[in-house]
Amino acid sequence: MDKLNVRDVDVAGKRVFVRVDFNVPLEDGRVSDDSRIRASIPTIHYLATHGARLILASHLGRPDGKVQDGLRLRPVAERLSQILGRNVPVTGDALGIGTVDAVKRLRNGEMLLLENLRFHAAEEKNDPVFAQQLADYAEIYVNDAFGTAHRAHASTVGIARLLPAYAGFLLERELAMLSKLMETPARPFAAIVGGAKISGKLKVLDELLKKVDVLILGGGMANTFLLAQGKTVGKSLAEHDMVEEARRVLALAEKKKVKVILPVDVVVAKEVTRGTEYKTIPAEKIPASWHIVDVGRATLDLMEEALAEAKTVFWNGPLGVFEIPSFAHGTRAIARFLATRADSGATVVVGGGDSVAAIQQQGLAERFTHISTGGGASLEFLEGRDLPGVTVLQDRPVLTPAEKGAATKRAKAAARAEAEAKKPAVTGRPAG
């Protein structure tokens, strides 16, 4: 899936509509985690320094087509301004005369941020009129929002059909990392899949079983697999109607000689709440009135033993009820262990969600090979499904050897020119 990127187009003096994913958490009117904002800075910086006039666009939360003051993008614009060291204004609405005028006033290298796209119901409906209104702002479209690439919305698909459409650096990196993960992983290859339900991850489990050597299962979905093994799970979250599917997955793993690791001991609690009584017990002895909320130490030892040999690891989903600190130990411990594996040279890719939160809360993010900005998008990509927001972008043409050589020369010349432009000017007396 080789798409043209922002380096493949002359953006100087052009209005460029950049779809970013600034769907970040807010606390007390401030951005509490700016990792998604920072992830698109390379694309924004490149376009600005090459003279583009940037119209940045994102959604925030789920306002259901209505204006909600708590989901306005002003805090995001303020954080972006701090990161860039320059003022990035946010418009009062994604549409309207005031926004049109603000776009027209942009100069080369300047940018603005449109107000929350999802304040308009037309965004999620991929409404062609709304898409055209967005397209009218710009001459070029760039998608750098991998987290929404699996959604066919007006700002991800509709507009991309109306303008020359290119990939941003973040989107390109996400696709490259996930493609490499599934196509040419260093072995042994281990996958850790957690989270609440097996039903939402059946397809990705099937795809992973074609590739991995070890499959580690945790979180609520592991409870359904414990049922498939004939164990009881008390009052734990489980999908009883998916037990046969879990048996099928286990049989498929055995057929493909994939080692499956399930909890052998678990943390159980009387209630899934803070301050409740909890204890660690063998997975065969779960009381009828208790809930499984985390994996135990023996299970972590099994997981770490398998992961110590892995040269490639993919992780998606927590191992327990991560939102409650007392039940987050397993997830946090695996995050720390995987950081040490990455330090030792293993490729460790994290596929979004609460796995990312466990990493960031412990200050481990910089140690991982890649942390995806799109949980749902990364899973759909690994399932082998087309991502609408990627498919619609322009494909890179297949070049002849002579054309490749010429393109390489042009790229090298451009890189030299860019390096020269960054050198400080030589000052002094004129000759003679």
Tell what function each PLM region has:
Residues 1-400, 404, 409-412, 422-432:
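Active-site loop-to-helix "anion-binding N-cap" substructures in soluble metabolic enzymes
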Residues 415-419:
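Intrinsically disordered, low-complexity, charge-biased segments
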